[in-house]
Structure formats: C-alpha cells, structure tokens
UniProtKB/Swiss-Prot annotation:
General function of this protein: Could be a nuclease involved in processing of the 5'-end of pre-16S rRNA.
Organismal lineage: Bacteria, Pseudomonadati, Pseudomonadota, Alphaproteobacteria, Caulobacterales
GO MF, one annotated term: nuclease activity
Protein name per the record: Putative pre-16S rRNA nuclease
Protein family: Belongs to the YqgF nuclease family.
EC number: 3.1.-.-
Keyword Cytoplasm: yes
Gene Ontology CC entries for this record: cytosol
Family annotation (PANTHER family): POLYNUCLEOTIDYL TRANSFERASE, RIBONUCLEASE H-LIKE SUPERFAMILY PROTEIN
Chief location bin: cytoplasm
Membrane-crossing segments per the record: none
CDD domains noted in UniProt: YqgF
One biological process term in Gene Ontology: rRNA 5'-end processing
Signal sequence range: none
Amino acid sequence: MPVLDIAEFAAAIPDYLPIVGLDPGEKTIGVAVSDVTLTVASPLALIKKTKFSEDAATLFQLMGSRKAAGIVIGLPMNMDGTEGVRCQSNRALGRNLLRLQPHIPITFWDERLSTAAVTRVLIEEHDVNRKRRAEVVDKMAAAWILQGALERMRGIAEAAGKGF
C-alpha cells in the first residue's frame, strides 16, 4: 500500500480500530494513539531512537497491543509551505515502515509549530519544568498531530454525508 493522502487514509481505516500518530525527532519518536471512534488522541509512548529495525519493532509492538490500524506521521513543513530536510527524513521513515509492513495505511500530517504549541501549553498552563517537558513534549506533540488529522478525517466524513 502506498503512502495515502488523508482522505484515502480515512477510507482505509476499518471501523472501531484506533490509529497512531508519530512525532519523529532526532533522538526520540513521540507516539500517540486515538480512541476507537477516532475522536480523541492521547499521548502513548516515547521511543528512544536506536537502530531503525529496533525502533520499528517497538512501534509495531505498541500498535499491536492497541490494535492500531494506521499511522499518521508528522511532517514539519517550513512556514512558507516548503519541505526541508526533516520532512525528507520523516517521509523516508514512512517509506521504510511500509517496507516492513506494506499493508498498514500511512499518511502524513502538517505538524508546523506542534512542538512549540505543546511546549507553550506545558509552560504557561501547567508550569512544567524543563526536565519534565523533555520527557513528555514529543509524545504530547504526537497527540497534537494526531488530533489534527482526526479532525480533518471527521470533516471529510461529514462533507461526504457519512457519520464518523
């Protein structure tokens, strides 16, 4: 299965199965999971990057334990809408995951400012110190990314006259 656009991705997800969202960084991959109604995203885990095969095995294990049916990968677009090096890296992650599990639907979601927004919330609303922020910001950013994709999927379903 190729990487899908968000509408194709939404159509490919079976009813009542969650999906995961990823916020890949240089040292970690934040992981979030949706509920089975694809309404709410929640932080799930933080994968400390080692070798790709080990990281992928950890991700697929998390997905299996939650019966997750698809993956949304954050795409850190530049503010002018262009793609930089990190976008290329995240797209490569998606392609590599598909090589290991070609049946899993994968899509990308524009994650501009997701980490900055989560960091701001943690500081301003929750007064979280720097050490604790470092522990949670990536998985919370993954939830932010996944929530955005879920809301777009809901909008697509509503526009098509389908319940979601």
